[in-house]
Amino acid sequence: MQIRPILAALRRHKMATLLIVLQIALTLAAVSNALFIVKTRVLHLSRPSGTDEAHLVAIRNEWIGQPDARHIDAQMRADLATLRNLPGVRDAFASQAYPLQEGGGGLVRIKHRVEQTTKAQLALSYLADEHAIDTFGITLVAGRNFRADEIGSLGPYDKVAPAVIIITRDLAHKLFPDDVAVGQRVYLSDDGPSTIIGVVDRLQGSYAGSSTRSIDEDTVLVPARYASSDDGASYAGGTVYLVRAQPGQLAAVLRAAPAALVAQNRMRVINPEDGMVTLAQARTKAYATDRGVAIMMGAMCLLLLLATAGGIVGLSSFWVGQRRRSIGVRRALGATRGDILRYFQAENALIVGAGVVLGAALGIAANLSLMAHYELPRMPLWLLGVGALLLWLLGQLAVLGPARRAAAVPPVEATRSV
Amino acid sequence: MSRAFRAAARGASLLTYYFDLAWRSCRRSKALTALVVLLMGCGAATCMVSFAVFRAAAADPIPWKSQQLFVPQIDNFGPAHNWKGEPPTLLSYTDAVALLQARQARRQVLIYGSKWTVLPGDAQHLPSSQEGDAVSHDFFAMFDAPFRYGGGWSASDDEQRAAVVVISSALNRKLFGGANSVGREIELDAHAYRIVGVLDDWNPSPRFFDVSSTWYPFSRPRQLYVPFSRAIDLHKAASTNFYCSTNSVDPYLPNWDSILHSECAWIAAWVELPRRADVERYRDWLHNYAAEQQRVGRFDWPPNVRLSGVGQWLQIMKVVPKSSALSLIVSVSFLLICLVNVVGLMLARFMRRAPEIGVRRALGASRGAIYRQFLTEAAAIGLAGGVLGLLLTALGMVGIGKVFEPEIARLATLDASLLLLTVLVAVTASLVAALYPTWRAAQVQPAWQLKSNG
């Protein structure tokens, strides 16, 4: 196939050629970036929280009238006993936040030594007790669980410095890349060391958004009950009871739990609107906009590809119409139908090729400028490759109709004139 | 018949003729026309939906007064602990109270947010938890908060740490069925408070006045307001933003007194400065205040203060979510790409009709007539795109909460100006896209087209 005649023909249609090249380039740049955003969103919203989400419910309980720490602590024990004894409940514990929530977890800074001057390792914490692992439905992969006598009581002014903690495997790897984490001592505050007694396989922090993406899997279980109605330095006032239902019993637990708590003691607030959420509900709510953005971007991509294909069909058939006479001449001089078909296909491949090169450059530039302003990782090059291949195929498909019409032009066309 | 009228009549009949030509050409290339209309409609609609959300998020919440309201910032963290040289967005208790007592502005207000439990009088109802702001008495006058019943409290109430409260209309409906409840008592955190005022439905969006402390400029409206001094007396902790450094662990604060004397930032302050001269004077006062703190040894760094207006403050607080700015950029680029596609499609469409143009030119149509004909066609297509865009925009406004933060999406409204803008954008975009193809069409030579094969 000769490239030279194609180029010569295209030179006569500079603007139209440029338009298709530009169209292809912009489409590639936009579609690859949009698909990339969709991919990161889908990845983000399909991350497992590590817990038995299908059977978990979080109940946010607030205390009334600033009762003192001793009263709250006693009430929490009583509440937990009530919840654990409810029919259909497998286990329950008290924390201050729950997975897939939009914030609310305590941020902790973990240091290897008190006098450490390098940046502390950030992590997200859940208050927990010896029932937390069973309630979450997570697995201990090393070490041991908390004991009942290790669970402390925290006031609003207290610093978080538990004697023992349990961390996730991800955090263990970050803190001790080449060492066993269990048995090591770290500092959550300057007041005293905390010994790592256990490692769990996976537990997501309480921030469903993307602001804490880098530490989402770095979670610390702190053995304590937060006994205050006030917001402290690390924890919001009130308590979150996490309850794990037996299989098939979630609906019954949802009905019975708040009533049982109110019957136990009326001096509390469980917001009827959003005081009680299942983790499935929390997931839907937290990722609603992610899903929406993914759908919108996908629809835009589809429309753009459609438009580009339409543009190619339109301009190609216009060209075919314009060149009927020259096609007739070529046919008369011995070119086969296949030759004509291939000519238009090669022309399209050439134009799309130019568009793809320009589009790849534009796409990378767009990705870099998005990265500068928004929290978006670098786009992998293979995605551009996939986009380019897709556009190239689309171009060939779009040009097929006009090219076949061109191939159908009879040689006698060369002799016709008005 | 006057000449002018004849000319007008002729213009009108020509316009009908052009529309007729456009209609014929659209019928001849249905798929191409449909694609152009679809592109214009979708391009315009996505732009309009993102624009509606952006407009809602970036709105001036108090346009009649935003030029007179300012937020003072005082750097009490110092260069080692502040955020890249910027002072904290809130004030420490020390600085907040100093500012309130200095009375250097026409009005000054301190704000911090907290949660209160409201105990109902009877045993049937369950207690509820309400979010409110602890504010000083100038709050209501400064932000023009409208009252349905009663009013705010006085300066002397502030001084006497009075147990008074202003409640929202929503809370008043919930507790008193909407009746005038001024003078009645409610129990907050097991203390009795006398209601002095009930606000009208009032929810500025974004809720600018406590944005620095609450982080929720579009949701969780405040249900009650109590005197700042009273809340401090009751050791009512802030349920909102509280930070003592931007880069290290918070200091140990064993009790309420240590919080008040700490250099932690947790109180929002606003000042009302009606004239430009007042602003300059206040800026100087802030600077001098910080210089004085340096002189007495509290700060060991030179004065680092800011005084920001409402608009500037909302920018500093990044109230417009990045996602809504991003979606505006994305949808505008989408429209641009659609435009490039439409230029290509129009070019194919117009040039295919070169023979027709040649015949019309040979029969005496001027270049101008060709311009008018094809631009009319483009405008007609744009109009159709605009109508489709209207439908899609309306549809988009329904599903808007699925793509944007629901709190902000709720504020985005479909009004007449948005409808008009949708059509305008579609028509203008079509005309711009048609410029080059029309120019090419007008260049068609009558003789050449007649000679060669069409």
Which residue ranges define each predicted feature?
Chain B
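A hydrophobic alpha-helix feature that marks transmembrane segments and, especially
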Residues: 51, 330-357, 370, 437
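Mid-to-C-terminal secondary-structure elements
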Residues: 138-152, 163-317
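Structured, solvent-exposed hinge/loop segments at the ends of secondary-structure elements
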Residues: 2-4, 8, 51-175, 179, ...
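C-terminal membrane-exit region of the final transmembrane helix in multipass inner-membrane proteins
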Residues: 421-454
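Membrane-helix entry/capping segments
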Residues: 1-19, 24, 28, 32, ...
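Short, strongly hydrophobic transmembrane alpha-helices
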Residues: 28-62
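Short helix-to-coil transition segments within interhelical loops
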Residues: 26, 350-353, 359-368, 444, ...
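Transmembrane alpha-helical interface segments in multi-pass membrane proteins
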Residues: 34, 340, 356-401, 421, ...
